[in-house]
């Protein structure tokens, strides 16, 4: 039996809807025992503060700066994560001393890889004090110091999961995470590992629904299912410079914008943006060394029926199969949080978190800042 560490992963993604929490036991390599998971939604008021913080973050020139609302926001965000951990431990009947480490992502408020600048607010030392558990945080910065894009970081976890795929799933396999921004991880039959952001995920759909006063997202894709794709608008998105050339890069929330309010009706806009999110995945996958045979989809976007219908139809044209991560034996809601738990253990072991083929860094790079209570 390998030396297993119990780790909690905490993820607050680009959708800014709340905190995902996951527990696993792992050696930081191929032994993974997935345990419980949960989520905690942010209040509407706190979500509004996060969005206001994105505006203040535009002024950041040095990643240690916290202009405007950001310093207090960082403190309050960290305390919310501490509450989430305490509640989770109580629900699971666990004590802090039974957890070896927390992997703490924080909230990305600025990501400019071309300037080697990425900022995730979240005070790891405060979280360690509040929970009584060691914390590893700030896992993207070291990758950038070595010429990487600082994203995506989940591929190391995907590679471990790929070793335990259900029988019958044909490779090459691509893991797709559809959060606010989508990313993909290609696991070749020869073990090749390639990853990059693939385009907008739920982000544009969510913003479109909010613009029209119809909530924070399109539940189940119901609005999109009643609309039609506007091909001219979709074409405009898919001709974005992000998709051109073979050089892949990571994305920030500001790289794509929604259509003007009067440009499309609500349903057609939602359907068009769902199509764009799906087509972006296939368009980005065209840069891979071999055509994928299976797409394993996680993240909130897999619950949008219109997006999944579009993705399935596009993949089938290329002879590929699309499967919800839940139906492949994984937890599609908790996968990113699980990854952060796994990466925290890898960090403690000095193992790489990123690779030249996943972020463009100059060598395999570990990372993260460890702090004790």
From Swiss-Prot:
Gene Ontology biological process: 1,6-anhydro-N-acetyl-beta-muramic acid catabolic process; amino sugar metabolic process; peptidoglycan turnover
Residues binding ATP: 13-20
Top-rank taxon, per record: Bacteria
Q: Does the keyword Lipid metabolism apply?
A: no
As recorded in UniProt, its EC number(s) are 2.7.1.170
The similarity annotation says:
Belongs to the anhydro-N-acetylmuramic acid kinase family.
Protein name per its UniProtKB record: Anhydro-N-acetylmuramic acid kinase
Upper taxonomic lineage: Bacteria, Pseudomonadati, Pseudomonadota, Alphaproteobacteria, Hyphomicrobiales
């Amino acid at each position: 039996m390998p030396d297993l560490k119990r780790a909690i992963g905490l993820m607050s993604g680009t959708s800014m809807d709340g905190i995902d929490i996951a527990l696993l036991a792992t050696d930081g390599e191929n032994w993974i025992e997935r345990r419980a998971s949960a989520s905690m939604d942010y209040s509407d008021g706190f979500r509004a503060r996060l969005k206001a913080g994105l505006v203040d973050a535009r002024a950041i020139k040095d990643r240690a700066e916290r202009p405007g609302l950001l310093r207090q926001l960082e403190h309050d965000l960290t305390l919310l994560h501490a509450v989430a951990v305490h509640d989770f431990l109580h629900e699971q009947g666990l004590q802090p001393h039974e957890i070896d480490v927390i992997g703490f992502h924080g909230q990305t408020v600025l990501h400019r890889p071309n300037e080697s600048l990425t900022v995730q607010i979240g005070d790891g030392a405060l979280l360690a004090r509040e929970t009584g558990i060691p914390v590893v945080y700030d896992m993207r910065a070291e990758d950038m110091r070595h010429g990487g894009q600082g994203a995506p970081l989940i591929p190391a976890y995907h590679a471990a999961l790929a070793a335990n795929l259900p029988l019958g799933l044909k490779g090459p396999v691509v893991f797709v995470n559809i959060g606010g921004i989508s990313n993909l991880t290609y696991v070749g039959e020869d073990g090749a590992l390639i990853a990059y952001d693939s385009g907008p995920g739920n982000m544009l759909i969510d913003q479109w629904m909010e613009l029209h006063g119809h909530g924070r997202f399109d539940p189940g894709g119901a609005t999109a299912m009643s609309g039609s794709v506007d091909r001219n608008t979709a074409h405009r998105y898919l001709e974005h410079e992000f998709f051109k050339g073979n050089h892949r890069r990571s994305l920030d929330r500001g790289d794509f914008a929604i259509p003007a309010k009067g440009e499309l009706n609500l349903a057609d806009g939602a359907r068009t943006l769902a199509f764009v999110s799906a087509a972006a995945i296939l368009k980005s996958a065209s840069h891979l060394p071999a055509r994928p045979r299976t797409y394993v989809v996680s993240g909130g976007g897999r619950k949008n029926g219109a997006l999944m219908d579009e993705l399935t139809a596009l993949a089938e044209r290329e002879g590929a199969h699309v499967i919800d991560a839940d139906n492949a034996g994984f937890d599609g809601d908790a996968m990113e949080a699980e990854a952060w738990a796994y990466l925290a253990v890898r960090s403690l072991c000095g193992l790489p978190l990123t690779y030249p083929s996943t972020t463009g860094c100059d060598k395999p790079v570990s990372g993260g800042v460890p702090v004790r209570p």
